[in-house]
UniProtKB/Swiss-Prot annotation:
HAMAP family: ENY2_Sus1. GO terms for cellular component: DUBm complex; nuclear pore; nucleoplasm; P-body; SAGA complex; transcription export complex 2. InterPro entries: TF_ENY2, TF_EnY2_sf. The keyword Transcription applies. Belongs to the ENY2 family. Component of the nuclear pore complex (NPC)-associated TREX-2 complex (transcription and export complex 2), composed of at least SUS1, SAC3, THP1, SEM1, and CDC31. TREX-2 contains 2 SUS1 chains. The TREX-2 complex interacts with the nucleoporin NUP1. Component of the 1.8 MDa SAGA transcription coactivator-HAT complex. SAGA is built of 5 distinct domains with specialized functions. Within the SAGA complex, SUS1, SGF11, SGF73 and UBP8 form an additional subcomplex of SAGA called the DUB module (deubiquitination module). Interacts directly with THP1, SAC3, SGF11, and with the RNA polymerase II. It comes from Kluyveromyces lactis (strain ATCC 8585 / CBS 2359 / DSM 70799 / NBRC 1267 / NRRL Y-1140 / WM37). Pfam families: EnY2. It is found in: Nucleus, Nucleoplasm; Cytoplasm, P-body. This is Transcription and mRNA export factor SUS1. GO terms for biological process: chromatin organization; mRNA export from nucleus; protein transport; transcription elongation by RNA polymerase II. The keyword Transport applies. Keywords: Activator, Chromatin regulator, Cytoplasm, mRNA transport, Nucleus, Protein transport, Transcription, Transcription regulation, Translocation, Transport. GO terms for molecular function: transcription coactivator activity.
Length: 96
């Protein structure tokens, strides 16, 4: 039983490491694409405008107003490429 637990621990560690590497890679890719598209600057401006317009400086209140607009502003090409990368990762680790 100890042998099995050891193998399970190694398998879990490898799976977790793979996920974390993927998570870092996808996050970096997404950040770069959003930066290249000008999305980050647009969302910063949108947030500033909302803070000036709103009586609230509460993060959650501002986020609730800005987030739907920000999500709609993501370039279709960026959205498609990131979703494809996620699908490829899932296909590699999940057997159907």
């Amino acid at each position: 039983m100890k042998y099995f637990n050891g193998l399970f621990s190694i398998f879990f560690f490898l799976l977790l490491t793979n996920y974390l590497n993927f998570n870092s890679r996808i996050s970096n890719q997404l950040n770069q694409m959003l930066l290249d598209d000008g999305w980050i600057d647009k969302v910063k401006q949108l947030t500033r405008e909302e803070m000036e317009r709103s009586d609230s400086t509460n993060f959650v209140d501002i986020l609730n107003k800005v987030e739907p607009q920000a999500l709609n502003m993501v370039n279709d090409k960026t959205r498609t490429e990131i979703l494809q990368t996620i699908k490829e990762f899932l296909n590699d680790i999940v057997e159907v």
